[in-house]
Amino acid sequence: MEYLTHSLIDETEALQIVNKLKAEKSSWQDGKKTAGSHAAEIKSNFQLDKNSKLSIELRDVIVNKIISNPLLKSFTLPSLIHGVMFTQSLVGHSYGSHIDNPYMPSGRSDLSFTLFLNAPEDYEGGELCIQTINKTEKIKLSAGEIIIYPSTQLHSVAEVKDGERHVCVGWIQSYVQNNEDRNFLFGLDAGAKGLLAKHGRSDELDLIFQAYSNILRRLGD
């Protein structure tokens, strides 16, 4: 399984978002409302109402940050970023092992992301656990860091033992649905851009960019 972690916003901006979320008193909902029938049985958290003024404001900020980041754009090839929500997990909250729905009312889920909004020392537990064939990856990032991973993976959120966990989650519908194809293109793009930075433009490099573009046309939706 290939996943990417990256700093999306700085810690100051992340703290400002958390403070806004904490100040919002009337727009929080039981997280079970947005889960499927099976997932609702194993999900406990609070989610900011997607239609609230604050949710729309913050969602636009996060989506714009993702699509304007060259590395994330190359890794995800985003056609649509959707289902973005802000969640709060208190002591005792968790989310058992589950798989994201392949198709949601808002779009197809090729990639899932979690943006950690508060510092890891602010809470105990609350790790994002992504299950692979051989092991379970436990991930708890610094404030402002994002992880993007295939929606095809089973994953869970460990129980929060102390403090509060604040994150933003969402899904990406990619122009290239297949994970292996998308990772291949990511490597090719990174290599070509590295050669461009090191050696400048050349006829040979133009052929590599041409190959990348035409492969994307063939593999894309």
UniProtKB/Swiss-Prot annotation:
This entry's comment on the bound cofactor is: Binds 1 Fe(2+) ion per subunit.
Presence of the UniProt keyword DNA repair in the record: no
The answer to whether UniProt assigns keyword Cytoplasm to this entry is no
One Pfam family, short name = 2OG-FeII_Oxy_3
Q: In the record, what terms sit under GO molecular function? A: 2-oxoglutarate-dependent dioxygenase activity; iron ion binding; L-ascorbic acid binding
Needed cofactors: Fe(2+); L-ascorbate
Instruction: List its EC numbers.
Output: 1.14.11.-
Q: Which GO terms describe its biological process?
A: DNA damage response; intracellular iron ion homeostasis
Q: Which InterPro entries match?
A: Oxoglu/Fe-dep_dioxygenase_dom, PKHD_hydroxylase, Pro_4_hyd_alph, Pro_4_hyd_alph_FE2OG_OXY
Keyword vocabulary terms for this entry: Dioxygenase, Iron, Metal-binding, Oxidoreductase, Vitamin C
Q: Any idea which positions bind Fe cation? A: 98, 100, 155
Describe the location of the Fe2OG dioxygenase domain by residue ranges. 80-174
Q: Where does 2-oxoglutarate bind?
A: 165
Q: What class of enzyme is it?
A: oxidoreductase
Q: NCBIfam families, alphabetically? A: PRK05467.1-3, PRK05467.1-4
Its name, as the record gives it, is PKHD-type hydroxylase NATL1_16191
Q: Which organism is it from?
A: Prochlorococcus marinus (strain NATL1A)
